Structure formats: structure tokens, C-alpha cells
Amino acid sequence: MCYISRMEFPLDLRFKLMALGSRLTVTDARGTLVYYVKQKAFKLKESVTVFADEGQTRPLYTINADRIVDVSARYRVTDPGGSEVAVVQRLGMRSFWKAHYQVHQGGQTVFVMREENPWIKVLDGIVSAIPIVSLFSGYIFHPAYTLSRAEGEAPILRIVKRPAFFQGRFRIEAMHLSATESLEVAVVSVLMMVLLERMRG
């Protein structure tokens, strides 16, 4: 297990069932809640709030899309004071087949997120549409994504869909990290990507 900036990896992501809009809990390797994520329902533009607690009393970040559903939408991450922390951008046409995102800070690209094998997600979506068989799709196919600091560099985080009935589960695994590296912005960016990719299937 790797302790980075109060987060002990791996991190487990679980979507709550029967909720208007997505609800996502993030726990660390000890089972401690790291984030509670709420995606607002019935919004033309994506709007997400990341809280430090499940009671939703301590907001940490707000993520808002810059436009109504668009292949190249940018998602602005701000702190409680409204200051920009980062911008997550889905790279348009390239993301139709294989998910590809960039994370920007101060106009510079600081992280790149990529899907490992797009065929896995395609098969997962096909099987999920078959009655009865769809109940087991979550145990057969596990789409995975990586986050690195630049194109072609070794990934520092890996995100994998986990086996689960009826609910979405993902895991964020630490890979090539320095002992003092802070990844809070990276993890929050991953949460936005997971919300978007889950909606895509």
C-alpha cells in the first residue's frame, strides 16, 4: 500500500444505487472515506460536487462543464472559494473510440488519461444489453484506464472497473509514484473521467 497525501492506495470507488444523479463514495485501503461525489440530476451541463463527508457539509471541489453535452467539453475544477484548480478536457473525436483526456493547470498539460483497450468496453456494453446475461457482465469485462504525467510516460495511476452486481465499482491503483508526490488533483480528475465513461457505457 502506498500513502500519498493522506490517501492510502488503492482507492475504491462505489456508485450508490437508486439515486437521482450519480452518487459516488471513494474509500482508501483502510476503508476510510476520502471523498463523497454528487452529480446533479437533470442538468443540461454536467455539474459535480466533491465533498469530504457523506453528509455533504464540507465541499472540497466543484466541477462544471463549459458547455452542453459536447465531444470536446472542458470540465473546470474549482475550490470552495471559486479559484480554478484544474481543467479536465475530453479530446473530442479521439475519445469516441478510445477515451483520451488531458488535465490542465495554468494553461499547461499536467496529466494525460487514456483507455487501455477500447474493445473491452465495447464487449461490456454489448453483454450488458442482453437480458439475464447482463447480470454477469460486471464479472466478465473490466475496462481499464491509466493516468500519466505526459504522453508516452509510465502511468502513475491505473483505474480498473471491478466485478460487481447491479452497481458500478472501480479501483484506483498507484503505480510509479515518488514518496512525496501529491495526487489530489489527479484523483479528482479521475473521478470526473469515471463519471463520464460510466455514462458512455
Q: In which residue ranges do the predicted regions lie?
A:
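Low-complexity or membrane-interfacial segments used for flexible interactions
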Residues: 2-61, 65-73, 80-85, 91-201
